Amino acid sequence: TFGPIVGMLPAVLGFPPVQSLVAVALKGGEVSCVLRLDLADATGPGGVEQLVHAIRGGKADGVIAAVVSEEAARDLVPSAAIQDALDGLSAGVRVVGAVVVDRVQEGGRWRCADGCGASGAVSDPKSSVMAAAAVAEGRRLYGSRDEVVASVAVDGARAAAVAPLMVGAGGPVGDV
C-alpha cells in the first residue's frame, strides 16, 4: 500500500508537499532519496528532466511518483499535463508505482494514477517511523514549504543592525 510511503514524505522533505510531483527513488528495495518539484514546473516544458537526471545519477532501481494536488485528486483521469509529466518520468526511469494524493496529512486520500482502482488513506505523517527518526535526529518538521523559506530568509532589520559590526571583519557587509 502507498499510504505509509505518502505519509513519510513530510518527514523526509521537512514539510508536507502541496501542488507537487514527488519522486521516491528506490535502490535495493529501500528509499534512496526523495525529490520534489512544484507541480507547475513538473508539468511545464522539460520539468521532469531534472528529476530523471537526479534519479539516474543515484542509480535508482525504480521510482514511486506521487502527484500531490487536491484538484488532480478530484479528477478520475489525470489531466493531460499531469499524464505528460508521469509519462516523461517513466520514459527516463522505471516507475514502479504512481499515485495521486489530495493532501499529505491525516485524513488525506491517495489513489493509483493509472486507474487500477487501488486507493486508501494517507498514514498519519506525524506518527510515521520517519517522523520519529527525524525528531530523534533533531530535525525540525515545518508545516509548509513557505515556513522553510521563511526560516532562511534574510531579516532586513537584523542585517542592518549587525552590518556596522561587520565593517572590517573581512567579508562584504552586503552579504550579512
What would you call each of these model-derived segments?
Residues 3, 7-12, 18, 37-176:
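Charged, compositionally biased boundary regions
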Residues 21-25:
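Short beta-strand scaffold segments in enzyme catalytic cores
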Residues 26-30:
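Short acidic-glycine loop/turn motifs at beta-strand connectors
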Residues 31-35:
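Short small-residue beta-strand/loop micro-motif enriched in glycine and branched aliphatics
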